[in-house]
A protein has these predicted regions:
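Extended, compositionally biased accessory segments flanking or bridging domains
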Residues: 2-6
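Amphipathic alpha-helical interaction surfaces in cytosolic regulatory modules
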Residues: 9-32, 37-40, 46-92
Length: 104
């Protein structure tokens, strides 16, 4: 199973990820377009004590993946997040937003 360690982005210096452009850069860095097409699940791990992923960062890094995989369930079956519960909950909300299934 391919693995993405978010510490590669944070360098253990920050506990938040924000910004659409940073999300796009992370998408390119980890070659998510290729991983989206690969049938093998991908584990994404967050550092201990991580606090927040902004919706703009999620949009940049994962919006194309959510659309490509066709559903929130498909996205989370393919990308498996090893993250605190509050982060996983936010990511689920953001994925729903990508597909326009929530009113905000």
């Amino acid at each position: 199973m391919p693995k993405i360690d978010i510490t590669e982005l944070t360098q253990n210096e920050v506990l938040n990820l924000s910004g659409h452009d940073r999300g796009l850069a992370a998408r390119a860095r980890f070659n998510l377009a290729h991983l989206d097409e690969d049938g093998e699940p991908v584990e994404i791990s967050f550092p201990e004590g991580f606090r927040q992923v902004s919706s703009s960062f999620f949009q940049g890094m994962f919006a194309d993946s959510v659309r490509s995989l066709g559903s929130v369930q498909g996205f989370f079956a393919h990308y498996r997040f090893d993250a605190p519960a509050h982060i996983r909950s936010k990511l689920a909300d953001y994925a729903e937003q990508v597909l326009g299934r929530r009113d905000y």
